[in-house]
């Protein structure tokens, strides 16, 4: 485990994704178990078994030279390797563990307004559960990983087994912000930015990035969630006043009030004040639960292999039952 830690996978991660369910501290002194653990480590880090067995040789996460890093500040590509690797491994486990037959892949339209029109929902406002339900129905999983190597990233979209997977890794629980990040990552798919072997990795949405791909993805996400018209601007300065006006805009224009506030925060750079305003709207919690519930409706943990269940233990939340996908 020390070599895995040196490779960027700390003890708590190694304990979840490598060691079997029945493992306890007493097993560490049983040499007969070593071959199985070596095999598990080799499979996880994608390394030759001979290298894993050479105790004097260092282990490392695979290189991902094709990964496209966006909105990254002061982090070298190599340091994100372990987090990218774990995200891909968990994404693969989710695809393999789908409840029933994999649905046909239907990528959302390149026109964000058309996707918004097609998306089933119970009100004029597009919210996180609407985005999640539509993506899973299209055969595109969304997973939120809690146990991640550091440094990590906010969101990644990758192609696994021929279909996109959206991977979230920061500890956000704000539904509107998570919906924006998810739609942003989907934009990288519909615009052709994300290809097999070339995941798009966004470290943090508040980090500036003038790349055309990021501008397109931001605009796509805004249009999906808010519609074709520009998000009405807020002019208030006090967080409670911001929240009140944003709530009025939601009622008038059908745009999530928290999204209105976050748009103001991005325009002004007042992200801390925007967070206070979203809190005043009681909009800071519930995102993790919504993502977990959508996951549980579509993934069969009971039917998953032991190694896939281990990888999927890294996700936020506990299994909430086995409802049939709707």
Language-model segments: residues:
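Active-site hotspot residues in diverse enzymes, especially metal/ion-binding acidic/histidine motifs
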Residues: 1-326
């Amino acid at each position: 485990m020390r070599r895995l830690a040196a490779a960027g996978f700390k003890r708590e991660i190694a304990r979840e994704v490598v060691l079997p369910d029945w493992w306890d501290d007493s097993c560490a002194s049983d040499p007969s178990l070593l071959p199985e653990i070596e095999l598990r480590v080799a499979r996880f880090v994608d390394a030759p078994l001979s290298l894993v067995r050479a105790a004097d040789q260092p282990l490392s996460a695979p290189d991902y030279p094709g990964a496209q890093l966006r909105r990254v500040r002061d982090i070298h590509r190599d340091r994100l390797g372990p987090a990218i690797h774990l995200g891909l491994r968990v994404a693969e486990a989710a695809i393999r563990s789908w409840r029933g037959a994999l649905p046909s892949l239907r990528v959302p339209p390149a026109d964000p307004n058309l996707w918004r029109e097609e998306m089933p929902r119970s009100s004029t406002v597009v919210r996180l559960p609407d985005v999640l339900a539509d993506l899973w129905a299209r055969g595109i999983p969304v997973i939120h990983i809690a146990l991640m190597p550091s440094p990590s990233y906010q969101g990644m979209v990758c192609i696994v087994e021929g279909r996109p997977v959206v991977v979230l890794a920061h500890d956000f629980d704000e539904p509107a912000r998570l919906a924006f990040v998810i739609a942003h990552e989907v934009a990288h798919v519909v615009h052709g930015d994300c290809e097999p072997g070339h995941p798009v990795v966004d470290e943090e949405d508040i980090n500036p990035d003038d790349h055309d791909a990021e501008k397109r993805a931001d605009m796509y996400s805004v249009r999906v969630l808010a519609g074709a018209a520009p998000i009405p601007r807020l002019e208030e300065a006090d967080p409670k006043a911001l929240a009140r006006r944003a709530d009025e805009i939601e009622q008038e224009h059908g745009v999530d009030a928290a999204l209105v506030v976050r748009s103001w925060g991005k325009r002004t750079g007042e992200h801390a004040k925007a967070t206070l305003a979203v809190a005043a709207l009681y909009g800071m919690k519930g995102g993790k639960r919504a993502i977990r519930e959508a996951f549980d409706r579509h993934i069969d943990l009971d039917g998953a292999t032991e190694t896939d269940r281990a990888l999927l233990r890294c996700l936020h939340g506990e299994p909430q039952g086995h409802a049939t996908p709707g």
